[in-house]
Amino acid sequence: MTSITANQKPSKLVPPHGSPELKPLLLNGDALNQALKLASTLPTITLSSRERGDLIMFGIGGFTPLNGFMNQADWQGVVDNMRLQSGDNAGLFWPIPITLSAPKATADSLNAGDKVALVAQDGEIMGILTVEETYTIDKEHECQQVFTTTDPEHPGVQQVLEQSEVNIAGSVEVLSEGEFPTLYPEIYKTPAETREILDNKGWQTVAAFQTRNPMHRSHEYLAKIAIEICDGVLIHSLLGALKPGDIPADVRQEAIKSLIDNYFRQDTVIQAGYPLDMRYAGPREALLHALFRQNYGCSHLIVGRDHAGVGDYYGAFDAQTIFDHVGKDDLITQPLKIGWTFWCNACNAMASDKTCPHDASEHVKVSGTKLRKALSEDEDVPDNFSRPEVLQILRDYYAGIAFDERAEVKLVGASAV
């Protein structure tokens, strides 16, 4: 499978999703300056953190081939059947709705064709939306379909329930990438930039490793399994908002860099980041992770235990089995499904449930939640949990937080095993 990158050189990488080329919606130069002037005269909608991250993904082409926030037909089709229903993209696979909401008073003042400025919570003008339609949704139905729960304690459900009353659909022009290029200059990469790096390495098969945690020994093991199968691995960190108790992106970046520098061959792995918030949608989010990794040029997505999960809402490997229900023509990027991985005391090495013959009493199952809990409570962390260089960076981070200011980390679901 080949695709054409922005500079039109032949590429061995997978093509973008639903399009022969990326479709970034970010303006620059004179077009940007003119749009900013126009935006200053328009009515405004204030974006949630999640909506802001989605808008930036539109801007950089991460959500190719979408051209804006979904209309009612697309919302319904995606929620119920994971398929877009309107326009040129009708029938295209898409697993999670990408929507914008606004208060009813704002929505009532808008007509099809109107333009509205999209503004971040800090006041920065992020984009312009041309209104296609406004519509209301059944929020609980969306939550049940996407998250398989309507429990308001679920952080993704909470995001949906807290949306404003009316959804606003329309195409967007994106005017800013926010703070990401400045805060994370070494790892924040657009899909086009990532593809250029992968092309320059001559890679064809690339496995993405999705992470919102510093990498512990099981993560390292998963990435090295993928390196044996593919030309290389893209360690792709989420840079947007997380839930309380998760470790900030700058600390994760430093910890992952230390791991790569000390324990990986330098020509087999790349660290990069992307601007989304977590939705914690488990299986459905795993599909979204694969879809937009295709836009970044990745042929595979590493899917281990409890991918994109939270608490005990999902089975340990639900995010793997959901791929079995996706047609081969719907999604080019495929999962690398890897089962339980752990440190085995008898093997004196990392192992998996497919390779280790020893009793479970010999196994030390490592999870990011267990690691965060131990560190946040100033407990000893066994050497087989994480590399010493990584642990030192994380200990230094927690040392800077007063004990009574640390978020409680609970072990539930797969993380408690």
Curated annotation (Swiss-Prot):
Domain of life of the native organism: Bacteria
Keyword Nucleotidyltransferase annotated: yes
Gene Ontology biological process: hydrogen sulfide biosynthetic process; sulfate assimilation
GO MF: ATP binding; sulfate adenylyltransferase (ATP) activity
Enzyme Commission code(s) on record: 2.7.7.4
Catalytic activity: sulfate + ATP + H(+) = adenosine 5'-phosphosulfate + diphosphate
InterPro entries in alphabetical order: ATP-Sase_PUA-like_dom (IPR025980), PUA-like_sf (IPR015947), Rossmann-like_a/b/a_fold (IPR014729), SO4_adenylyltransferase_pro (IPR020792), Sulfurylase_cat_dom (IPR024951), Sulphate_adenylyltransferase (IPR002650)
Disordered: annotated span: 1-20
Pfam families linked to this entry: ATP-sulfurylase, PUA_2
Gene3D superfamilies membership: HUPs, Sulfate adenylyltransferase
Polar residues composition bias: residue spans: 1-10
Enzyme class name: transferase
Record keywords, A-Z: ATP-binding, Nucleotide-binding, Nucleotidyltransferase, Transferase
Biochemical pathway: Sulfur metabolism; hydrogen sulfide biosynthesis; sulfite from sulfate: step 1/3
Keyword flag DNA repair: no
The family this protein is said to belong to: Belongs to the sulfate adenylyltransferase family.
The protein, known as: Sulfate adenylyltransferase
